[in-house]
């Protein structure tokens, strides 16, 4: 029995409440594949679902990679760690490729509003960034370059079409700056991007409407936290490398 759009959306909401994010992602993938432009609510459900699905694998990958490094003297343990890490990597890559296919095939081509276009291009940058975290060699170069390209395109549209206080524009600046810091190892560029976004938003705080006030100020706080952390790390202090992301 094929479910219609409203039933799939309802299923996604139920799955979210039950914290069954794989089910939530499957439901929202089916909604997307129907080929209509998503509403803001549907867009957010899709984003939350995949963010949790991929987030669980990114977190597992970091834990196993760290354990793998600590077992260098024990070949058997290290081999087991390596195999398990590769299993998680394969899952993570499948998820990212799923999202990237939805973006290229449906979401980006169907986006009529600049806000949606920026949202989806940011998402494209994010999922190529997640791929680049686990990639190596030529594959890494390709994913890094694709990520930067998507972020850059989103960034240019956002500067032209959106207020500096818009939560999507701020979220993009946050993640693009994390990309510069973590993936390109360019702390100066990361700090400059984050600081500019923060300062421009502060200067226009009075343009914030009530519904996005909470979202915007939360992201501004994350931008400021990252700036504080990155500045202290570059001055040689041992900082906690837990960058905030949107």
Curated annotation (Swiss-Prot):
SUPFAM superfamilies: 14-3-3 protein
Signal peptide from the UniProt entry: none
Pfam family of the protein (one): 14-3-3
InterPro entries, sorted: 14-3-3, 14-3-3_CS, 14-3-3_dom_sf, 14-3-3_domain
Modified residues annotated as N-acetylthreonine in this record: 2
Crosslinked residue numbers (Glycyl lysine isopeptide (Lys-Gly) (interchain with G-Cter in SUMO2)): 51
GO cellular component, one term: nucleus
Residue numbers of N6-acetyllysine PTMs: 5, 51, 70, 117
Keyword vocabulary terms for this entry: Acetylation, Cytoplasm, Host-virus interaction, Isopeptide bond, Membrane, Nitration, Phosphoprotein, Ubl conjugation, Vacuole
GO molecular function, one term: cadherin binding
Modified residues (Phosphothreonine): 2
Modification type Phosphoserine: residues: 60, 186, 232
PANTHER family: 14-3-3 PROTEIN (PTHR18860)
Family: Belongs to the 14-3-3 family.
Full protein name: 14-3-3 protein beta/alpha
Native source species: Homo sapiens (Human)
Lineage of the organism: Eukaryota, Metazoa, Chordata, Craniata, Vertebrata
């Amino acid at each position: 029995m094929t479910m219609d759009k409203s039933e799939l959306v309802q299923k996604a909401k139920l799955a979210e409440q039950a914290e069954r994010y794989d089910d939530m992602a499957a439901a929202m993938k089916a909604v997307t594949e129907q080929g209509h432009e998503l509403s803001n609510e549907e867009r957010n459900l899709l984003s939350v679902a995949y963010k949790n699905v991929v987030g669980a694998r990114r977190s597992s990958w970091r834990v196993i990679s760290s354990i793998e490094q600590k077992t260098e003297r024990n070949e058997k343990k290290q081999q087991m760690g390596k195999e398990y890490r590769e299993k998680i990597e394969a899952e993570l890559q499948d998820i990212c490729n799923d999202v990237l296919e939805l973006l290229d095939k449906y979401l980006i081509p169907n986006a009529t509003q600049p806000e949606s276009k920026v949202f989806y291009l940011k998402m494209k940058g994010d999922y190529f960034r997640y791929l680049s975290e686990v990639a190596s060699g030529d594959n890494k170069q390709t994913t890094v370059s694709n990520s930067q390209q998507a972020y850059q395109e989103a960034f240019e549209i956002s500067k032209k079409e959106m207020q500096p206080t818009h939560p999507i524009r701020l979220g993009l600046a946050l993640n693009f700056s994390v990309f510069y810091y973590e993936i390109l190892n360019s702390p100066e560029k990361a700090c400059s991007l984050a600081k500019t976004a923060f300062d421009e938003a502060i200067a226009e705080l009075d343009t914030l409407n009530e519904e996005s006030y909470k979202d915007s100020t939360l992201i501004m706080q994350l931008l400021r936290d990252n700036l504080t952390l990155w500045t202290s790390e570059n001055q040689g202090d041992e900082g906690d490398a837990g960058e905030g992301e949107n």
